[in-house]
Amino acid sequence: MASMLPPVMLTLPEAQEEFHDLLRKLRDPHNQRKLIDWIKYNWREDDEESPEGILRSIATDIRLHLPIEAVLPSEKIIVPTSGENSDCDPKYTRHVDSFLYDNELLHELTAKGVIESHYCVQCGSTKTKSLTFISHSASRAQIAYMYNVLLPPLDDDKVLLDVGSRLGPILYGAYLYTNVGKIYGIEINGELCRMQREIVMKYGFQDRIEIIDSSIEKRTDLLATADIIVLNNVFEFFMEPNEQIKMWKLIYERVKKKALLVTCPALDVTMESLPDNGIDMDKWVQELDVYNMDAPDMPTDDPELKMIHLYEVINPGKTD
């Protein structure tokens, strides 16, 4: 019976030399670059020092300082009157932050009764309906999808801006998953800015992340210079429709050509809920396909992930 040979174990220099040999065999520099990108996107570590592990740790830290709904008294929530979230009756809607409470933890807390999940349709009866859960943050799964699947590689000469960064998960994800050189989070709530800065300092992110306590109206320079702008549920629950239109017009006019916009929900969904907004979507942006369809263990058909869309600005807008 033939004996099984033990696997060949390489030293680091030997592995590096074999890798260089493999790249040389590809010859085409474009394919060499694609292989390097493929390795970067598809290599996964699952420990406390991995991006996933660090984001879990950050979420644990933040949960200690916030109520479950992760909405501060200093924040004013405005229930949408149009669009797909106009049915969010405050009596039957609960704000549960998806970054802080993933589906597994949410299920555990609802099972224990810590978070209610149903309401009584008729008092004294057994008729119940499910409550609606709303989050104002991207989940950790959405963050991983955004940087590992949706976007192309972000190099150190690029600038990323998160408008309305709140707890900062988009910023921390950009730091951990990409090489993007500068990461700005602009947030109008001073308490949230302080919390973000504490996380940035604790985890040593201050070399690339900067938190700006201001409104985007006062810092249009950031819109004009950013290469990637993230707009995650940014205005809908915090502004009246006329103010939302004002903000979107500002973005429409100030972002530069070829800038990438990451939005949740899709831009057309947002614009449909804001009629007479003066924005010509067809001339302004084109939607881009997912960059890395080969990412492992990443269910790109997941409805939660499909809510996130990527656009390239093809013609900076001008409104009347």
Predicted regions and their residues:
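Conserved acidic residues
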Residues: 158, 181, 227
